[in-house]
Amino acid sequence: MDKVNNNCCCGENAKPCCTDPNSGCCCVSETNNCCKSDKKECCTGTGEGCKCTGCKCCQPAKSGCCCGDKAKACCTDPNSGCCCSSKTNKCCDSTNKTECKTCECCK
């Protein structure tokens, strides 16, 4: 299992986490917020008081798991969260942010 960065998505991680619709950033609670639009303070400063323990945009990139029109950015962006749809096996589907384990794309 890849080690998850337990810090909020700030600093160098802020831009892709906050602006990439395929980032997989789906933290919604007060204590697990990662550059959510209504919590922009997470994107600046040190991120103190902002615990990001399970945010997908803080996870390392998952290799060999991206396809579609967003393939390039998804495959190279360490904050992509690399998501896919289990039905169509289409990676980086921002409408279905589930972990991609058996994606055949980019093999």
UniProtKB/Swiss-Prot annotation:
Keyword vocabulary terms for this entry: Cadmium, Metal-binding, Metal-thiolate cluster
Keyword Metal-binding: yes
A GO term, aspect molecular function: cadmium ion binding
Signal peptide start and end residues: none
Induction cue: By cadmium.
Propeptide position ranges: 1-2
InterPro entries (alphabetical): Metalthion_7 (IPR012484)
Family: Belongs to the metallothionein superfamily. Type 7 family.
Described function: The metallothioneins are involved in the cellular sequestration of toxic metal ions. Binds 12 cadmium ions per molecule.
Name recorded for this polypeptide: Metallothionein-1
Organism: Tetrahymena pigmentosa
